[in-house]
Regions:
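PP2C/PPM-type serine/threonine phosphatase catalytic domain
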Residues: 1-268
């Protein structure tokens, strides 16, 4: 089993009209898989956090997820998002557009790599990204990795899973409780790099002091329900690194059937 990857928490400025952000990240292979196909990228200079959960044979999952986070983060490092202080609204809209453009580039390059190398054909990845800009966070999602927010005791899933069972829930065919136990709950309807184009869900959320954002792969929430995840965060004494470590440990204790990755960020 590979050792868990850890990024220590610290305070860093968020770009543009900035606040401060504490963060921690951790990724673990789990107790069953032989390799880790999840990838993480945090760039506190640009305010971007990205998490991807790859899929595909011949190491295709590892390649796809690594390409996704590197390309998206690289776009913001190469072309930093800069706007005058009096253009906050325009900046948020531009942030969302920039994020979509970067994700579209990642999709194209992963897809093209699959065409060039037949053994990687069909590889793809989920992706969730959070771009912190001033008093707002722009969130993008594809697949079944998730973004949650903990605000004043209320723990809420902000993203919608792109899965067959989620569609069944929306059509009233099954309940959310049944969806959690469904054998096909990991069957996704949307992924990055599988087709020449991809639809990305994008939203912009206000950020309040004390808000905690969690980006995670399905290796976490397939093992722990939302109540258990919140319990771990609440009982970490405000220490994000402790919370990240305990989330990984709890998911492994419950079975650790998949790779487990988490990014936690708290606004000051």
């Amino acid at each position: 089993m590979e050792a868990a990857q850890t990024i220590a928490p610290e305070w860093r400025p968020i770009p543009l009209h900035g606040r401060q952000l504490a963060y921690a990240a951790r990724s673990d292979t789990g107790r069953v898989r032989s390799s880790n196909e999840d990838s993480l990228e945090l760039d506190l200079e640009t305010g971007l956090m990205v998490l991807a959960d790859g899929m595909g044979g011949c190491n295709g999952g590892e390649i796809a997820s690594a390409m996704a986070v590197n390309i998206v983060a690289g776009e913001f490092r190469q072309f930093p998002l800069t706007l005058p202080p009096d253009e906050v609204s325009a900046g948020l809209s531009s942030a969302a557009m920039r994020l979509c453009t970067a994700i579209a580039k990642a999709n194209r390059e992963i897809y093209q790599q699959g065409l060039i190398q037949p053994q990687l054909s069909g590889m793809g990845t989920t992706l969730v990204a959070a771009l912190f800009v001033g008093a707002r966070v722009t969130i993008a999602s594809i697949g079944d990795s998730r973004v949650y927010r903990l605000r004043q005791g209320h723990f809420e899933q902000l993203t919608v899973d792109h899965t067959v069972v989620q569609e069944q829930v929306e059509y009233g065919l099954i309940t959310p409780e049944q969806a959690r136990l469904a054998g096909n709950r990991g069957l996704i309807t949307r992924a990055l790099g599988v087709e020449a184009g991809v639809e990305v869900d994008v939203q912009e959320q206000p950020m309040l002091p004390g808000d905690v954002f969690l980006l995670c792969s399905d290796g976490l929430f397939d093992m722990l329900d939302d109540t258990e995840i919140q319990f771990v965060i609440d009982h970490a004494g405000g220490d994000l690194e402790t919370a990240a470590q305990h989330l990984i440990e709890a998911a492994n204790y419950k079975g650790g059937y998949d790779n487990i990755s988490v990014i936690l960020a708290r606004a000051a």
